[in-house]
């Protein structure tokens, strides 16, 4: 997925991780006796229970969610197996190395287990755990559009072009919020103080509470959508939701397995809504699923607008001011 405002991304290839496992020795005898475990060809290494092979379709765990993925490379290093996986339907810049304990066999049984934990089978296939029919790349005849500058969050592209799947408007008041946010961070060099209260988790909970109060219940599909939105926020924030001068703050605030959704608030959640149409162009949805998703997005934006004075910060602070207070 393109990232106009994140730090420069590097598309790592498997060659960057896997070296030549063959020894350059003078004889077969030397090769067999003068080598350690790391230099053995992969075929000679023992395969532990649950070993996954190159090209195998799997369920891979990321940010507490399982997604459909494919194993591209396998490596035995530091006394453990590691797997380079590609998440189906995602840009290759999301490919990553993960450990054995983050993989599940792609089986009906495992899919059912995830369903019992709150993810529906179709949702596992989606980058956001939403019910979709399948993942597929963008059609070659769909224009990518002009390349935007590195340090910007696109605040004007709030309506999806007609040749894409999803279309919703960002209310004028929230669009102004985005523009003010842009000016504070990029021009005035001020940041939102972290951690935010309420954070993204808290905002989504408040939204659920409002739906419960309004309708007397919350549907399973809405809970699934909100869970997917949270997972997607956690994955997308460091990649495309930060301005360059926010990155140091991110590195200092999000570490040790902390989820961005527990640290950041409405300001960055709103940035995600700007990006969602562009990101969901890769997802092929049934018509009724698309309408449900779109209606929920519109309603969440309406909720953000209605509670704008409570959910969004009124003042941004200079970095020096925050560092002085922390000291």
From Swiss-Prot:
Keywords for this protein: Chromatin regulator, Nucleus, Transcription, Transcription regulation
Known partners and oligomeric status: Interacts with HAM1 and HAM2. Interacts (via MRG domain) with CO. Component of the NuA4 histone acetyltransferase complex.
UniProt subcellular location: Nucleus
Organism the protein comes from: Arabidopsis thaliana (Mouse-ear cress)
GO biological process: epigenetic regulation of gene expression; regulation of DNA-templated transcription; regulation of long-day photoperiodism, flowering; regulation of timing of transition from vegetative to reproductive phase
Name by which UniProt lists this protein: Protein MRG2
Residue ranges of every copy of the MRG domain listed in the record: 162-327
Tissues of expression: Ubiquitous. Mainly expressed in the vasculature of cotyledons and leaves, and in roots and inflorescences.
Effect of loss of the gene: No visible phenotype, due to the redundancy with MRG1. Mrg1 and mrg2 double mutants are late-flowering under long-day growth conditions.
Stretches for region Disordered: 1-40, 133-156
Ranges of residues in domain Tudor-knot: 52-101
């Amino acid at each position: 997925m393109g990232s106009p405002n994140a730090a420069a991304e590097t598309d790592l290839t498997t060659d960057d991780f896997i070296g030549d496992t063959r020894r350059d020795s003078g004889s077969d005898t030397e090769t067999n006796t003068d080598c350690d475990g790391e230099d053995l060809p992969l075929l000679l290494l023992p395969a532990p229970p649950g070993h996954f092979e190159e090209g195998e379709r799997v369920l891979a765990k990321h940010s507490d969610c399982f997604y459909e993925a494919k194993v591209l490379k396998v490596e035995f290093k530091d006394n453990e197996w590691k797997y380079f996986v590609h998440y189906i339907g995602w840009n290759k810049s999301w490919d990553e190395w993960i450990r054995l304990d983050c993989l599940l066999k792609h089986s009906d049984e495992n899919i059912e287990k995830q369903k019992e934990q709150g993810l529906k089978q179709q949702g596992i296939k989606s980058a956001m755990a939403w019910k979709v029919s399948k993942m597929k790349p963008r059609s070659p005849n769909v224009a990518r559009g002009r390349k935007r500058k590195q340090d910007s969050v696109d605040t004007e592209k709030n309506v999806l072009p007609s040749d894409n799947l999803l279309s919703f408007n960002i209310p004028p008041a929230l669009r102004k919020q985005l523009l003010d946010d842009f000016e504070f961070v990029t021009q005035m060099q001020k940041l939102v103080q972290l951690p935010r209260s309420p954070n993204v988790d808290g905002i989504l909970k408040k939204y659920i509470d409002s739906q419960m109060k309004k309708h007397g219940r919350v549907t399973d599909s809405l809970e699934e959508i909100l869970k997917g939105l949270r997972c997607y926020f956690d994955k997308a924030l460091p990649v495309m939701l930060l301005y360059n001068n926010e990155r140091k703050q991110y590195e200092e605030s999000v570490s040790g397995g902390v989820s961005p959704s527990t640290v950041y608030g409405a300001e960055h959640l709103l940035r995600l809504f700007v990006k969602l149409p562009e990101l969901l162009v890769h997802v092929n949805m049934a018509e009724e699923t698309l309408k449900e998703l779109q209606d929920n997005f519109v309603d969440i934006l309406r909720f953000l607008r209605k509670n704008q004075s409570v959910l969004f910060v009124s003042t941004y602070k200079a970095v020096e001011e925050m560092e002085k207070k922390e000291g």
